[in-house]
Amino acid sequence: MSRRKQGKPQHLSKREFSPEPLEAILTDDEPDHGPLGAPEGDHDLLTCGQCQMNFPLGDILIFIEHKRKQCNGSLCLEKAVDKPPSPSPIEMKKASNPVEVGIQVTPEDDDCLSTSSRGICPKQEHIADKLLHWRGLSSPRSAHGALIPTPGMSAEYAPQGICKDEPSSYTCTTCKQPFTSAWFLLQHAQNTHGLRIYLESEHGSPLTPRVGIPSGLGAECPSQPPLHGIHIADNNPFNLLRIPGSVSREASGLAEGRFPPTPPLFSPPPRHHLDPHRIERLGAEEMALATHHPSAFDRVLRLNPMAMEPPAMDFSRRLRELAGNTSSPPLSPGRPSPMQRLLQPFQPGSKPPFLATPPLPPLQSAPPPSQPPVKSKSCEFCGKTFKFQSNLVVHRRSHTGEKPYKCNLCDHACTQASKLKRHMKTHMHKSSPMTVKSDDGLSTASSPEPGTSDLVGSASSALKSVVAKFKSENDPNLIPENGDEEEEEDDEEEEEEEEEEEEELTESERVDYGFGLSLEAARHHENSSRGAVVGVGDESRALPDVMQGMVLSSMQHFSEAFHQVLGEKHKRGHLAEAEGHRDTCDEDSVAGESDRIDDGTVNGRGCSPGESASGGLSKKLLLGSPSSLSPFSKRIKLEKEFDLPPAAMPNTENVYSQWLAGYAASRQLKDPFLSFGDSRQSPFASSSEHSSENGSLRFSTPPGELDGGISGRSGTGSGGSTPHISGPGPGRPSSKEGRRSDTCEYCGKVFKNCSNLTVHRRSHTGERPYKCELCNYACAQSSKLTRHMKTHGQVGKDVYKCEICKMPFSVYSTLEKHMKKWHSDRVLNNDIKTE
């Protein structure tokens, strides 16, 4: 038995049933009394909140049955009139003991009370006390232990629909003002009568729970009326205690396990005060209260609610509301749960929680997170920065002098693999019978096209070397490479790589060693010309000797194709001077199969059989595949780089002047019916000695273009080559349907447009019309001059000037090379940088 029951027995006995309120029994000399209506021993009482009947605790079942039978006793409003007036706030602070409600039931009894009856009219203080106890609180009591009667704690319940609606009215016991909502009753009690029931947050600040609340906080309250069936209004502050479910035991368990320890005391549900489904519940009193106390009403609407979801919550509508509000700073990450963040009401500057997780800084205050900037590669010697590490490695070698790429055929060494490949071209015109090697040890020929074998690729590269040797031995008038110019080009290209990313060379400038070679086409010629081998003298045997040295004679299709060329050349040799042109194939035929066999004449003059054999071999082995749809036939540019110059002839020193004259004439004529019109006519077109008998303009045929050549572009598109002798007599200009006009007259390479062909011709003629005004650099293409000019300075970049010749450079390493090349006897001064 408790100390209170032993020392101070209660006034009521087991048999004394009093219809009066329990508060009237307590006297002024008992300020520290504990729970109300607790008789001595087991005579603890249960008081009906409707009729104020007292039941012994042992008769709890009778009490429950009494409640089930819908007690129709007197209204509690009449009893509440007798209560004393409201105490002062000082008396409220003195009270420290929790007050327990008069209706005491155990959690097991909640199941029995789960089906609430209609017409129940409990006193509102019990409801408030019980609900406050769910939150770990209890109603304030006076210094004498009596419940404070001030905050209008009376309520009447409608006789019907109790499980679906709140009490029909709430009446303040002090001023008798009725309210239809408990929330407005609480506002009235706090603002009008001075009670501290809930905390008010300042404008714009989140509500924080109050730690110390006056007038007694209780942690236990065994009594609990059947409130699970009494649905409190959604705009009621007690709505935060509502838990989905129909059983009060489940509700109490959820309340103990799910509620955060320190949430706000009371707060209205979000936006429900404007819900059209609930607006009719707001009576005139409530609207008047909102008008009378606008500040309190506005503050209440800003309170953060407990994030428990009412059963009638419309999730789809709420989500649409949240999705529409996207212009806000993110919420704090310290929310109890995602569901609570989802249901959190947002102020005008807030952001939906599902859009704000994880929280991000506002856009105006900090930029969005980005990846760390890429570290620039800078040279340790001159400070120049590069985008790629590979460019820095190559540039660093210009300072260190390292030259890791060495030529296997000479003492040349360079800093880049591309330079070594370019250098290896110089060996193509020398007398080396071996295939040159690049820096990687492989053949300079690129990989063969898809569909060809490795054998073909290696054979084609070897054949290229053989033809180059054959040309160098039999063409003493071949224009040699200019070593100084080549070195200058190397320097220029290195500077361009340092200035910018390496650009793709145009099709006319790219050195492409790979070329398509069809074994089927070779076999076709092989089968069509067996036994047609004719000896043509010692010079013609020079190439077979080289082929034997290169083990090419063991490859049957190479050997027989070569002998077939010699046989055809011998049979048609006497027709060379009579024919000025040869009939060409259809213009729409495959460009990649457009090579012809040189018939041994140039400008109507005969040439040595060996020279024609070399040209015939190169053309013969490069015939397209039988199918016009093969990858070889689709190539716009023939992939062969034999760079065959015009064969040896009289007046070799006058060749280029004749070509330039013919080129100028072709620019003026632009006759579409001329096979080389529109800047593509023969370089020898202006020679008067080639006029025909009838006075018509005759164009001499470039090497490999005369009659009797084997056409690689048959009209059937089969790709098979057929010996063809021109039908029309001399003097007839080439037809519109003749040979493609974008084919090089020297090497037979086909180009996509005439501008590329024009630039390509300069590689044969040596013409360099574009000259730098600051140095002696000259080139054949305007774009190269443009790139070269960047080496002399760019807008916004530092300029380095030579102290001796005052030549500007945009890259310091270029100045170093200039000094080494032109002023090697001078010492380079470091203070030469100018802005």
Curated annotation (Swiss-Prot):
Changing residue 66 to Q: In IDPFH; de novo mutation; loss of function in transactivation of transcription; reduces the interaction between isoform 2 and isoform 3; disrupts the nuclear paraspeckle distribution of isoform 2 and isoform 3; does not affect the interaction of isoform 2 with TBR1. Residues 682-696 have a biased composition (Low complexity). Pfam families: CCHC_BCL-11A (PF25491), zf-C2H2 (PF00096), zf-C2H2_16 (PF23611). A zinc finger (C2HC-type) spans 45-71. Residues 737-835 are annotated as: DNA-binding. There is a cross-link at residue 634 (Glycyl lysine isopeptide (Lys-Gly) (interchain with G-Cter in SUMO1)). InterPro entries: Dev/Hematopoietic_TF (IPR051497), Znf-C2H2_CTCF (IPR056438), Znf_C2H2_sf (IPR036236), Znf_C2H2_type (IPR013087). It is found in: Cytoplasm; Nucleus; Chromosome. Zn(2+) 4 binds at residues 802, 805, 818, 823. Gene3D superfamilies: Classic Zinc Finger (3.30.160.60). Its main location: cytoplasm. Changing residue 60 to A: Impairs self-association. Abolishes self-association. Reduces expression in erythroid cells. GO terms for cellular component: cytoplasm; cytosol; nuclear matrix; nucleoplasm; nucleus; paraspeckles; postsynapse; SWI/SNF complex. Residues 574-584 have a biased composition (Basic and acidic residues). Sumoylated with SUMO1. This is BCL11 transcription factor A.
